UniProtKB/Swiss-Prot annotation:
This is Elongation factor 4. It is found in: Cell inner membrane. The keyword Cell membrane applies. GTP binds at residues 19-24, 136-139. It comes from Methylobacterium nodulans (strain LMG 21967 / CNCM I-2342 / ORS 2060). One of its GO terms (cellular component) is plasma membrane. CDD domains: EF4_II, EF4_III, LepA, lepA_C. It is an enzyme of class 3 (hydrolase). Belongs to the TRAFAC class translation factor GTPase superfamily. Classic translation factor GTPase family. LepA subfamily. It is a peripheral membrane protein.
């Protein structure tokens, strides 16, 4: 196979908000260039996980190579990198974008620009992309292409006069998109003679091949049998096979500059291949790695426990398998007095947490309980050291802590004008500070700084419900700030329940504690003795509810007779109850845990 002229290659990605038709457009492009026969076409070819298809989101970046003969008679190679659109996966997005020179910005002509479109477009602009706007769904009666064009120009500031109007569903005008890619996007640059330098875009685990690595060659040539070095992980491998995706794997002898393909090199674990790493030849390495590589840091932590303790080993095996495929997910063992053995897991964000939990339940048939999600706090100790706290139950003695810092995020919320008041109130209730508010057409764009701790519970659900689903939300972590945070413990019958302890802001502690106690009062079944349910900060009780005792009518056999006889029986019962309360164990049912952890409004 001869080397392709570099000016016939186009690497592009598609940037869009969820549901604006990104994967459908990708399907049409694949169909039109004849990469798959009609029989093999399924909806959303590139979203290979069931969960991706069902939720209509793209999680892992995928790629496909299309051959397209343009109207000028030349055959071009188009490498489409399908990027995730969701905020939790921004790092994956940035790496996919770094592998391309241009982007198609897909905007739904009936809905206009959304918050995540903005976030990803700005990333594309940061990566110096040429951007071609595409208006999708123009066959809908509600489509307003002119208004949306104007919106793109106002909000994003790119020229939308030549935006391509299409309908990905019906296949209308798709050819024009391909022509625009060829005409407007720049070809890649690269030097064949230079030492090998390639960007590791993504990696996943294949049962037969081991780890498959998706690469974009920047300089040099990657050949079969070469010995390569991953510069960030500092590991050396021999390349077994090289190929490209048309969406099916097809082997090739070599990949030249500007090309995108995959390699396998009997790598055992996905954790050894870090997204964004630089790959070079071991014998003749490149001088400097590619910029922008950073190890993935989990943001949200929560404990996952099997409902049935006997399932623990299965859970451990399942976690290991998922970790093979998703290096951004981390876990370690933990035990809890209330829930038994389980794992403390770290995630990129809430969607990531939901997806991992759903995949564990679905693909491995496990029943799981997850504890309340928490974020990573920084504790500045009195002796001058700094510790990270992942689990509120491990909090050291308050006297040894100087200050506690919590992560803050910068959130951008786009909402229709009618719901602006409720959205501002929600942000205010969550200890937010307003940074900016301006109007984009008929919609308000609000920028807020919020503590991540307040967002991880149910901020997203609340935002959707107060705006009837119209508000869209995007965030990135900005910095750590000192906060007046306290550890709230829940005591049942004067015994602390570790799985329910949490760090809260002092101003919110009382209301949160009271709500938790009320909830548990309804959920824990009554026992033969009275049970106090308390919320405490240190030694100070801030809220209490009492679960009444079930009492047996001991005086039922006394008909009439002396009052002292009845009193003797009642006193005897009282003594017994007192003893029970001292030694009695309160069993908290699983349902109570699940419901108490879900509670948060």
């Amino acid at each position: 196979m001869t080397a392709k002229p570099i000016d016939t290659i186009r690497n592009f990605s598609i940037v869009a908000h969820i549901d604006h038709g990104k994967s459908t457009l990708a399907d049409r492009l694949i169909q039109l260039t004849g990469a798959l026969s009609a029989r093999e076409m399924t909806e959303q070819v590139l979203d290979s996980m069931d969960i991706e298809r069902e939720r209509g989101i793209t999680i892992k970046a995928q790629t496909v190579r299309l051959d397209y003969t343009a109207q000028d008679g030349r055959t071009y190679i188009l490498n489409l990198m399908d990027t995730p659109g969701h905020v939790d996966f921004t790092y994956e997005v940035s790496r996919s974008l770094a592998a391309c020179e241009g982007s198609l910005l897909v905007v739904d002509a009936s809905q206009g620009v959304e918050a995540q479109t903005l976030a990803n477009v700005y990333q594309a602009i940061d990566a110096n992309h040429e951007i071609v706007p595409v208006l999708n769904k123009i066959d809908l009666p509600a489509a307003e292409p002119d208004r949306v064009k104007q919106q793109i120009e106002e909000v994003i500031g790119i020229d939308a006069s030549e935006a391509v109007p299409i309908s990905a569903k019906t296949g209308l005008n798709i050819e024009a998109v391909l022509e625009a890619i060829v005409a407007k996007l720049p070809p890649p640059k690269g030097d064949r003679a230079a030492p090998l330098k390639a960007l590791l875009v993504d990696s996943w685990y294949d049962v037969y091949l081991g780890v498959v690595v998706l690469v974009r060659i920047v300089d040099g040539v990657l050949k079969k049998g070469m010995t390569i070095r991953m510069m960030g992980a500092d590991a050396v491998y021999g390349v077994d096979r090289i190929g490209v995706f048309r969406p099916k794997m097809q082997d090739v002898a070599e990949l030249g500059p500007g090309e995108v393909g995959f390699l396998t090199a009997s790598i055992k674990e996905v954790a050894d291949t870090r997204v964004g790493d630089t790959i070079t030849e071991d014998r003749r390495p490149t001088d400097s790695p590619l910029p922008g590589f950073k190890p993935v840091q989990p943001v949200v932590f929560c404990g996952l426990f099997p409902v049935d303790a006997a399932e623990f080993e299965n859970l451990r095996a399942a976690m290991g398998k998922l970790r093979l495929n998703d290096a951004s997910f981390s876990y370690e063992m933990e035990t809890s007095a209330a829930l038994g053995f389980g794992f403390r897991c770290g995630f990129l964000g809430l969607l990531h947490l939901e997806i991992i939990q759903e995949r564990l339940e679905r693909e491995f048939n496990l029943d799981l309980i997850s504890t309340a999600p928490s974020v990573v706090y920084r504790l500045n100790m009195s002796d001058g050291t700094m510790r990270e706290l992942h689990n509120p139950a491990d909090m050291p003695d308050v006297m040894k802590i100087d200050t506690i810092e919590e992560p803050w995020i910068r959130a951008t919320i786009l909402t229709p004008d009618d719901y602006l008041g409720s959205v501002l109130k929600l942000c205010q209730d969550r200890r937010g500070t307003q940074i900016d508010l301006n109007y984009v057409g008929k919609r308000a764009m609000v920028v807020y700084d919020l503590p991540l701790n307040e967002v991880v519970f149910d901020f997203y659900d609340r935002l959707k419900s107060i705006s009837k689903g119209y508000a869209s939300f995007d965030y990135h972590i900005s910095d750590y700030r000192e906060g007046d945070l306290v550890k709230m413990s829940i005591l049942v019958n004067s015994e602390p329940v570790d799985a329910l302890s949490m760090l809260v802001h002092r101003t919110r502690a009382e209301s949160r504690g009271r709500a938790m106690c009320e909830k548990l009062k309804d959920l824990i079944p009554r026992h033969l003795f009275q049970i106090p349910v308390q919320a405490a900060i240190g030694g100070k009780i801030i809220a209490r509810e009492t679960i009444r005792a079930l009492s047996k009518d001991v005086t039922a056999k006394c008909y009439g007779g002396d009052i002292s006889r009845k009193r003797k029986l009642l006193d005897k019962q009282k003594e017994g109850k007192k003893r029970m309360r001292q030694f009695g164990k309160v069993e908290i049912p699983q349902e109570a845990f699940i419901a108490a952890l879900k509670m948060d409004s």
